Amino acid sequence: MAKEIIFSDEARNKLYEGVKKLNDAVKVTMGPRGRNVLIQKSFGAPSITKDGVSVAKEVELKDSLENMGASLVREVASKTADQAGDGTTTATVLAHAIFKEGLRNITAGANPIEVKRGMDKACEAIVAELKKLSREVKDKKEIAQVATISANSDEKIGNLIADAMEKVGKDGVITVEEAKSINDELNVVEGMQFDRGYLSPYFITNAEKMTVELSSPYILLFDKKIANLKDLLPVLEQIQKTGKPLLIIAEDIEGEALATLVVNKLRGVLNISAVKAPGFGDRRKAMLEDIAILTGGEVISEELGRTLESATIQDLGQASSVIIDKDNTTIVNGAGEKANIDARVNQIKAQIAETTSDYDREKLQERLAKLSGGVAVIKVGAATETEMKEKKDRVDDALSATKAAVEEGIVIGGGAALIKAKAKIKLDLQGDEAIGAAIVERALRAPLRQIAENAGFDAGVVVNSVENAKDENTGFDAAKGEYVNMLESGIIDPVKVERVALLNAVSVASMLLTTEATISEIKEDKPTMPDMSGMGGMGGMGGMM
């Protein structure tokens, strides 16, 4: 297929048009008074969302060059969501503002490479300043405030997440599910999560979520590789008679054995799934033992004189449910005895007290959290399926933002932290590098401007007032239309969200600004069907039979 090559300003301007269209769709969702976006689906009812990344993912433009620009910024939103869990709209708005301002300067003759260098230096300085401005999350109240802001000022969701984190600890596992009623619920269940996903996508039982969901499964634990399925046959036959699912956790399951399990799953002979054992070496053995104690099973280990062939159904662990995605496995309500679990917890605590290695201590604490923390399940209720999806998106965002806040600390919210950080940096740059730094510094006003605009206030006046405020914690509460102490009012953001959004925005904007040529496919118009209107008389050909 023929390709079209476009150069310099013409190429960048086309890319900018795509970025602008994406930004225009995403920016309306920003802030406490942001609006919803209605998205048509190829099947089913349209969805309503106020989640920036959900809007960005749906934007596909007709013009291939514009779509290239939009897709790069869409990637920024998606990457920010993956890394920080929130800040997707902030990243999009910043990327657009930096690209717009940079394009104007490059069109006027600035050197793109020098401009990029200045942008990178400014970004580095602002990130360092944000870290200085941050402070640790002190208590449950602040956790609730972070979650509330991220859940579009929904205090109920904020309090629910704070309760969940209080019950399972900051390192505990919190999952979000759909409730059967219209009420939100919080359930804490004993459970364990480890970072190993399914060995084959053919094990998936929930195609929409791309997860394996096993109800009341047996759990087989083996500390070596499974290469030959013949050794597994005795226990598989016993499992088949019970009609229950089976989860195999082993060092690995090699080609032929895995293929046979997949075939049996697809034919409906066995409801089975398999994951690799977590950890490596001695730590893997210890974690398998943790899982065995939690589920009331035994690790089949050749070191203990046991072979896979000798395994019986009595050696298997059990749980009320197991959920596996491509990255993680969560075991809920293991059937292990509480006394054994408590003894194991105390043993790990003793090891933590004795160890001199920071790395070992960190890994032991991870095991302790998995064994004793349990799993908190937030069940989201709503009157309709559309509302349910929108609300679940907000809870997921809020949960990720809260974890980010606990991880790296908090700064004042509402776009004010970026402006306060900008005021503190002093860069000694010359020429086009100074222009690059100034572009980033000016763009830092964009999130606050957008929040004020969406709330119906004069953006210029709001930004000016926040910039000139004497108290460094002063910002604009768009929900009330007042200038307040953001910390006292509970309007706070995780510093990780601000940092990741800025880094990703500068990264994509600098790539776009240093683009000198684009290559895209030329869309050929497909010939239209010939007019058949003159052939109406052919209907009488039925008489030829």
UniProtKB/Swiss-Prot annotation:
Classify the source by domain of life.
Answer: Bacteria
Q: Which GO terms describe its biological process?
A: protein refolding
Q: Can you name a GO cellular component term?
A: cytoplasm
E.C. number, please? 5.6.1.7
Q: Which GO terms describe its molecular function?
A: ATP binding; ATP-dependent protein folding chaperone; isomerase activity; unfolded protein binding
**Could you say which residues bind ATP here?**
29-32, 50, 86-90, 414, 477-479, 493
Pfam families named among the record's database cross-references: Cpn60_TCP1
Keyword vocabulary terms for this entry: ATP-binding, Chaperone, Cytoplasm, Isomerase, Nucleotide-binding
Q: Where in the cell is it found?
A: Cytoplasm
- Reactions performed catalytically: ATP + H2O + a folded polypeptide = ADP + phosphate + an unfolded polypeptide
UniProt xrefs under PROSITE patterns: CHAPERONINS_CPN60
- Coiled-coil regions listed in the entry: none
Report the Gene3D superfamilies cross-referenced here: GroEL (3.50.7.10), GroEL-like equatorial domain (1.10.560.10), TCP-1-like chaperonin intermediate domain (3.30.260.10)
Location, primary (coarse class): cytoplasm
Q: What family classification does the UniProt entry report for this protein?
A: Belongs to the chaperonin (HSP60) family.
Function according to Swiss-Prot or TrEMBL:
Together with its co-chaperonin GroES, plays an essential role in assisting protein folding. The GroEL-GroES system forms a nano-cage that allows encapsulation of the non-native substrate proteins and provides a physical environment optimized to promote and accelerate protein folding.
How it assembles, according to the record, is:
Forms a cylinder of 14 subunits composed of two heptameric rings stacked back-to-back. Interacts with the co-chaperonin GroES.
Q: Which PANTHER family match?
A: 60 KDA HEAT SHOCK PROTEIN, MITOCHONDRIAL (PTHR45633)
According to UniProt, the name of this protein is: Chaperonin GroEL
Q: Which organism is it from?
A: Campylobacter jejuni (strain RM1221)
Lineage, opening ranks: Bacteria, Pseudomonadati, Campylobacterota, Epsilonproteobacteria, Campylobacterales
